[in-house]
Regions:
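Short loop/turn and low-complexity linker motifs enriched in small/turn-promoting residues
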Residues: 20-146
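Sec-dependent bacterial lipoprotein signal peptides
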Residues: 1-20
Length: 146
């Protein structure tokens, strides 16, 4: 029985480790990120929590896949000024909306919510840039989604 418990704990730990983002953190790459293209803004999307590590849906901006909701990971998308919907879908689609201005940086936090069968990822636009930058600091840059 003890051996079975140890095996289960090790398997669970492996899933958590494999499912988490790895690579350079926002703090490490911030200075080397390309500048925001002229006339565009940048949307950063990040997930700080390990809770629900196995739940990693694709994240969309205006129905275009831009990344994946990996624990402790972030990605960004440069877009023209305008109104945008950021969404993630598991059993249900959760979304939040934002308006982007030229040169502006907006931050969207991906929160984990309980669900009937699986957890849900719910995007939440962060009210101010300082909070977003503070929360994203230890998240790792994710590769582009294929």
């Amino acid at each position: 029985m003890k051996h079975l418990f140890t095996t289960i704990v090790c398997a669970f730990a492996s899933v958590l480790i494999v499912g988490c983002a790895s690579g350079p953190t926002y703090s490490e790459v911030k200075a080397t990120l390309p500048p925001i293209p002229k006339g565009q803004g940048r949307i950063f999307v990040y997930r700080t929590a390990l809770l629900g590590a196995a739940v990693q849906p694709k994240v969309k901006i205006n129905d275009v896949v831009v990344g994946q909701a990996k624990p402790r990971g972030f990605f960004y998308a440069d877009r023209l000024p305008g109104h945008y919907e950021v969404s993630a879908t598991t059993e249900w689609k959760h979304k939040d909306e934002l308006t982007l201005a030229p040169g502006q940086r907006r931050f969207v936090r991906l929160n984990m919510l309980p669900g009937l069968m699986v957890g849900h990822i719910s995007p939440e636009v962060v009210a101010d840039e300082a909070t977003g930058e503070s929360e994203i600091a230890k998240c790792s840059l994710l590769p582009p989604v294929k």
